[in-house]
């Protein structure tokens, strides 16, 4: 019997109404245990209400963003001028790093967390859109500061930061032992999920996370994201009986960030 715990987190909750419904479906009928919501989305409050009514057991964290397409910050433009283009929208992910001021990033991300809590719910954890805190050590520092301020777990940033001592940066911040990002785009398949489950069983550590992007498709998503059709396939796989049985056969316990020890 395995003692492994697995968080399966769906990113982008509240991105569009169809994304929200796809994530709820993957939770209610499938293996998704957790999600992270976008307070900068115009559909955020609608998504939180949908979760309250239709998926009360779904853990929800904050998906901090600096790069959400066609979205604007929570704070007024004059307070975060380095984060936005001339029209007041977030920079594209390909160029934002050279533009942003870290103090403004801290203030905006802090405002996003506060906006989430104004929905009447405390976040389960925090992570970031496009995993920006896992690609830039300075942005990781901002995310860690906010995790400490609010005493929230933070997604493991080990994938992209090329340093052996990155975990030392976390110190008293709770994080899964390992983050598994491989279930994405062309690698979306039942075989990929089964391989990741085997990695969980064979790896050191107790708590693991697989991130995913299940969704239904609407015209809003098609107009805003280049990653659309694979999301439907994710819903199909994450609600499949084969995946449910594979998790049970390996003795893996589905969990959320509350499973991380204080």
Curated annotation (Swiss-Prot):
It is an enzyme of class 3 (hydrolase). Keywords: Carbohydrate metabolism, Hydrolase, Magnesium, Metal-binding. InterPro entries: COD_ChbG_bac, Glyco_hydro/deAcase_b/a-brl, YdjC-like. Its EC number is 3.5.1.-. GO terms for biological process: polysaccharide catabolic process. Mg(2+) binds at residue 129. GO terms for molecular function: deacetylase activity; hydrolase activity, acting on carbon-nitrogen (but not peptide) bonds, in linear amides; metal ion binding. It comes from the Bacteria. Pfam families: YdjC (PF04794). Its cofactor is Mg(2+). CDD domains: YdjC_EF3048_like. The keyword Acyltransferase does not apply. Belongs to the YdjC deacetylase family. HAMAP family: COD (MF_01246). PANTHER family: CARBOHYDRATE DEACETYLASE, YDJC DEACETYLASE FAMILY MEMBER. Probably catalyzes the deacetylation of acetylated carbohydrates an important step in the degradation of oligosaccharides. Homodimer. This is Carbohydrate deacetylase.
